[in-house]
Every structure is written in structure tokens, then in C-alpha cells.
Amino acid sequence: MGKDSKKHKKERRRERSPSTSDSDEERLQKRLAEQRSLKKDEKRRQKEEMKKNESAEEKRARRMEKKMRKDAKRKDADAEDTLIPPELNYTNLNNPFNDTKLTQTFVWGKKLEREGKSGLTQDEITKQTSQRIRKNLHEAAEFKRIRDSRAAAKEDMEMMKRDADLRAGQISDTKEREFQMDQIKERTRIRIDQGRAKAIDLLSRYARFADENPHTAKIPDFELENPMEYLKASCKSVDDYEDLIEDIKTYREVDGWAKNETWWMDVTRIAEDEIQKKAAQNRGDVHASVQTEVQNMFKNKSIDELLKLEDQMDAKIRGNSGNKGYWQDLDDQLKVFIARKRLREHHGRVLRLQLAIIKEEQKKEIQQQESEELLPVAEVPPQVKIQKEEEEEEEEDEDDEKISKKVRRKIDVQTLDDPELDEPERERKWRALTGDQLDDVTRELYRIGCYSPTYISADDTMPGIEILDEQADVDNLTERRNRNRGTLPSSSAASSGAPQGASSKMMAIAREGMEADESIFGAEEQLAAQRHLWSDKYRPRKPTYLNRVQTGFDWNKYNQTHYDQDNPPPKIVQGYKFNIFYPDLLDMTVAPRFGLTSCEDPDFAIIRFKAGPPYEDIAFKVVNREWETLHKNGYKCQFQNGVFQLWFMFKKYRYRR
Amino acid sequence: MSGVLKSDGLEIAHVEDDRGVQGEAAIIDVDDREEYFVKPLYTYYCTCGEMAMISDTLINRMPKRERDGARVITPDRTTAKTFAKPGETVYVKRSPAVGLEQQYRKMCKKCSIPLFYQHPSALNRTFILADALLSAQEVGGFSGNNEEQRAKKVIMKRNVKNQGKMGSVTVSTMEGEEEEEMEARETAESYTMNARIVHDALKRKGIGSGKFAVPQTPSSSSSSSAAAAGSETPSVKRKRGTLL
């Protein structure tokens, strides 16, 4: 390489000399050439002297140094084309492959021959190889960039998807809640249609109607009743009221909390008051007589006055003046009173609106009829005036109950008995009627059917026949029925109150010979449901009874040792006396029977008495011990005069040591 | 007590007729469903407990007479059978402007209280005196056959199988229960039976080991009644609200 560069320099010099024609420059050139040749000769002389003087080791070091300098030069010249990474620090002399041409470009001779490129020089081969390698590296970098961008895009898509899923999850919760609210409304409608509505269903229907139709001329398809009637009819116990309060909260969530706020709060307060009443809690520090006076004070006052009174009471409670418990309790009662009064007034307003609508419709009908008769024009104005005056007078005097009667929906009787209507539909319509509606419908049916009998004049009857007075006849029948119902059986003789004649005789027979050691025994054992073939014809019932338990001391060895007459032992059951009354037994010739069965407690047994119709079986739980069955020991088993008597004592065991 | 069907809905095909290809036994399953409405019968009693009337209509749905509150049994819209013996003929004085009403009264077979009456002009109509009859619930007591049932829809399923020479027809009116539910219920019942048997066996062993215990002195009547009453288990607080 060095020789080639020297040749290059010489060629350049030769090229320059013919172009220069100046003599001065020629002289400078000659002098420079001479000086250069002199320096070279000196250097050559110095080298030869050093070579002569140096030792073998110095010679080896010099040569290594020279070679390394050459390698460094070559390395610098080929720095751009070097393929070995700089971290490896591999050189031609220092590499684990023992390859002295490591830094040179590999030449694949046979391939070049095959491709017809054997004429290329080393520089060209190196250049092509470098270009190919650079292109490959560039392509790899391009692929890496594409892969990274694709991964980043995928990650972005995943992030967006996750956000969308989160948002959708929140929406699904909301939709679930909305679905439940819709189902509540749907279930309410179904319960009302099927005639098994709850209090919350009726209240919500009333609230929705009163809210949606304040001035619309729409007649409701149900009977407008006072909301308090819904509460009384549906809610029977504390649990029902508590359920109602929760249901009201749920329904306000369905319809929106702001709708009918005052109305719902009033209903809730009344329900809470009913809960307190049924729980029989103490009403505070107010005496019972004062409560009546308080209620009278609240009456005959408008809602505004009551609200002012409430403010005054709140001020007194806050000011701690007087008896705080008294004012607190009074304030609670006042709130409930205001709620009830407000509900009543609201209902009155709704009814008056409905009445006005109905009257408008009636006026329209009258006008239509009058328009058909146009001839008597002169008579129309005075009639209208008279009607207006009458209506004004009626409106002032009417009460809420009268208004509700007028607003009451007229029932189409023909629809209920329509033969084309199928059975389920008819049954549903009948069941939807209230008590008053049912009464009206049945009276209308009687009138339509023309069931009234023909009446006879008093003159047409025979002279001596007995004529019953209407009221006297009714009274007589009622008395006989009550006497019949009075003899119905009760669960025990003690609760029968005033027994009748026959019962008193039976009672006397049963109580005969009662001693101080005996007490009335009335713990009846509950039997499973009994079914008899005759239960369709006769009303099954339980017989009445008067049973006694015989108690006394048991002077066994243990008790003789530890007790005496002054300090007696506890009494034990020594016997039973069952007296069961069967006054209405159909077949008096067959006596009742009894049987013993075991029960869970081995110390006790169940004795069961069985008789014929119309009496059901009756059972008692008795001590499980052996009976004495001899008459002289108190055993008695007889059925006489409608009284079944079973008396027995338990056996006593005595032994001698 | 359900009403009898007027039309014969059980047209059972002759199962031996082979409807398939001749020579080959064809298995044919025919599933048929028929819905009809069951109206229950209501039993009414006299105040003494004697059965007085069976009707397919509730008393409070019969036409009501304004004058005395009686109800009318009309043959065209009510089917009812009365159980009563003939009573006396009575002339009831209504208001002076109206006149006298002649009634043929019928009495209870047991206590002889008048329950029904008829008029000479229309013997096909029977009137029920007001407050004379009591329903099963009003009389009180328990009777499995007389609970006032609501009118309900009954689904009758008819399944016809025809397998050549053999065939079977299954008619079922079970209320909406399918075979799977029946099998599940039978399995549960068998489990219950096994549990009861095991319980009895354990109890028997317990009683056997009890022989060596010291026998207790029999207690008095008050303690026996107290033992019979037993202690009440504290009830778990129930969730409030019925809508959700």
C-alpha cells in the first residue's frame, strides 16, 4: 500500500513538471529534491547503524511495533468497512480463531467464478460486500421499527378496549337497576289485574292517577277510595306495615323521589304511627285523659294553623322550657294528625275534580239532547239558570262521602253475565269487585231478573190464619240461630263462659266428688290433620272436656328418709280423670274408645279418644306409668248420658327388705 | 270436587291401528294439551253444623232481594242442591201498602230452623233467608275437603304412544309439573326417607344407652305442661320489603 501511494506521488510530480516553465520554480524544486534525498540517506544510515547494534530481543520488539503500526494504519483506513464490533477488540494477531486475515473481507472464489465476476478487484469486492451488509442492517432496523410500532398500536387498542369494557360494566349495572324497576311496575300491574293487589300496589296506582290526571277529562277504570282504606284492608300486622314502609321507599325510587313527596311522606308517617300503636309501646309522659283533650285541641283547625302550632312546639322543645317529654310526645301526635288531615284533604280535592268532570260530561249530553229539539227556544234560558242555582247549593252542602258515592263508577251488569265471555275472564271480573260493588251488582241482578213475588191482600186470606209480623219473624230467626251457634264447641270447658242447660248437667256430673288434691287439666295435645269420610255431611268439631289430675305424695323409702309430715316431698301425678262430652253423637249406642301411643319423651304417652261423627279425635299427653285396672282402686270407664268418663290411678310399688 | 266436562274430550284413538309403513313397526308419539276451567263447589252449613246446600256460585254473588236481604237461587245461572225438610206455610206481613207474602218454608233437618223459602207463583226459584247459611270458613274447624277453593285453570296433557302391537295412552292433569321435576321430587323424598331411618336408628341407640342412666322421678302436672310447651326458637329477623 505504501509503495502504491509513493507511486501516486511520483506520478503527480511528473504531471506537474511539464506544465511549469519558470526557472525559479525549477531551482526550488531541485533544492527540495536534494534536501529530501539527503534526509533519506541519513535515515537509512541511522537505521543500518541501529540494526548492527541492537540485540535479538530488541529486534523482535521493533518488528512487532512496526507491524502493529501498520495494522493500526490499515485499521484506520478501513475503519468504515470494519465489521467486527468495537467491543470485541479482535485483531489479526489477537483473536481466538487463530486467523491472521480476520479483518480482511472474505472472498468466495468459486462463487465469483460461477457468477462470472472473477475479474473484480479486491477493492470492488470489499465495496460490494460492505454495501450488501449495510443494506441488510438497514433492512433489519426497518423491520424492528415496524414491529415496535405494531406492538405499540396493539397495546393502544388493548387500552381502549379495557376502557370500553369498564364503561360498559358501569352501564350494565345501571341497566340492571332499570330492569328491576320496570319489573316492579309490571308486577304491580299484574297483581292488580289478578285481583290480589297489595297495599303498595293500590297506593301507587292512586298516586299515579292523581298525578297524571289533575285536569284531564279522564275517568279512572278503578274505584277511587280513600288511601286509608287501602291500608286498613291490606295491612293487618306490624310486619305488613314495616314491609309497606320499605316498599314505599322502593316505589319512590322507581317514580322519582320528587314526585308526590308530601303525599308519600304522609303515608309513611301514618304507617309508622300504626306500628307504634300495634306494638303497644308507651306513648310517653302524657296521661290517657290528657290525650283526648289534645286530640280535641287539634280538631277544627286548618293545616296552616296546625303547622304554626308545630313551629311553636318545636320552639318550646328547642328552648327546653317546661316538660320536654310532654312537648316531644305532643309534637309527634301533631305530626301524625297533620299527615292524616292532609291526606284526607288531598283525597277530597281529587274527588271534587272527578265530580266536576262528570258534571261537564252530563252537561254536554244535555246540550246535545237540547240541540236536537230546537223548537222550544224560549224555554231554555230559565231552565239553565235554575239548574245552575241548584248545583251551586248542592256543591256547598256536599260532604266527601257523598262526593265519593257520586264519583263511584257504574258497573255494567250485562258484562258480568255475558255468555260470550269465557270463564276465566268472568271469574276475574267478579273477583275484582269490592264489597259495595258486589252488593249493587246483586241488587241489579235481582231487579233485572224480575224475581219479586206477587203479594196477597189481607182480605183474600182465610179468616183464622196466622200472619207473621216481619220484624218479629226476623228477630225470632236470629235468636234461634244465635242459640244454635252458642252450643258450638270450644276448645276447653273453662273458656265456654256460660254453659247451657245440658252442658251444665254434664259439668255437674264431671265435677262430682272433686277433691282438694285435684286440679283441672286442660293441656290438649295437637293432633295431625284428620280426614273422615263423613266430613262432607257433618261439620267435624272437637268435643268439650273437663279433665282432672290427681296428685299426692309418694312415701317411698327415699322420701320417708328425707321428708316427714311437716316437711313433705313434692307431689307427683297419681292419676287422671277424663270427662269428655259428646252430646251430639249420632250413634249413642257405640261408646267412644281410647288408645295409648308413645311419644318422643319416654316418660309420657299420648292418650287418644276416638268417637263417631260429628266429633273429631282428641288427644292428651299423660304420664307413662302402669295403670290400676280394678274398680276398687279407682278405675272407671263408662259412657253414660253423653259423657265419657275414664278415671284411673297409677300403680304403687312397695317392697320390704 | 271439580266440574264434569260437558263434551267428551278424551277421544282416544285405537292404539292398535298402525299408522306407519306397513311391515315396519313405527313409533309414534302424539302430545296433546287441553286447557279447561275448573269451578269449585261451595258447601254451606246451617248454624247447627248440618250441611244445608252445595252450590257452584258463592252466596254473595247471587241476586239479592232488597226487601229482606234474601238471595235467589236461579236455575238458569246457578246449580245448587239443598238439604232441607219441608216446613210450614207462612204469611209474612210486609208494609201495609204492599200486602202479605206467602212463603213455603224449608227447615234444617236437624234443628228445624227455617233456611229456605219459595213462593206459590214461582216454585222453581228458591230463596235463602238472610244470614241463615254459613260457609265452611265461618263455621270453623278443620276439614280438608271443604276449603274454599279458587277457580283455576287446569292443563290436561294427553300423550299417545303407538308401537306396532303395543301402545299406551297417558292422560295427566298434574299442575305444570314435568317428568324431570317428578323424578327430582322422588329422589328428594327417598333421601328424606333415608334420613328418617338413620335418625330412628340413632335414637334407638340413644334409648339403649339410656337404660344405665338413673331413672328420673315423675314430675307434677305443672312441670309436665311446661315441658310439653317447650322453648321457642328465636326467629331470624326477616328481610323487609316485598317488591325487590
UniProtKB/Swiss-Prot annotation, chain A:
Q: Where is the composition biased (Basic residues)?
A: 1-15, 61-72
Record-linked SMART domains: CactinC_cactus
Subcellular location as annotated:
Nucleus; Cytoplasm
**One annotated GO biological process:** mRNA splicing, via spliceosome
Q: Which gene encodes it?
A: cacn-1
Write out the biased-composition intervals (Basic and acidic residues). Answer: 26-60
Molecular function via GO: RNA binding
Query: What Gene Ontology cellular-component terms does the record carry?
Result: cytoplasm; nucleus; spliceosomal complex
Low complexity composition bias: residue spans: 489-503
Sorted alphabetically, which InterPro entries does this protein's record hold? Cactin_C, Cactin_central
| Compositional bias (Acidic residues) | 389-401
- Family classification: Belongs to the CACTIN family.
Please verify whether the record's keywords include GTP-binding.
Answer: no
What is this protein identified as?
Splicing factor Cactin
PANTHER family, alphabetically? POLYGLUTAMINE BINDING PROTEIN 1/MARVEL MEMBRANE-ASSOCIATING DOMAIN CONTAINING 3, SPLICING FACTOR CACTIN
Protein role: Plays a role in pre-mRNA splicing by facilitating excision of a subset of introns. Plays a role during early embryonic development. Required for the distal tip cell migration at the end of larval development and for gonad morphogenesis.
Coiled coil ranges (UniProt) are 23-77, 352-403
Q: Which organism is it from?
A: Caenorhabditis elegans
Region Disordered, annotated ranges: 1-83, 369-406, 472-503
Keywords recorded for this protein, A-Z: Coiled coil, Cytoplasm, Developmental protein, Nucleus
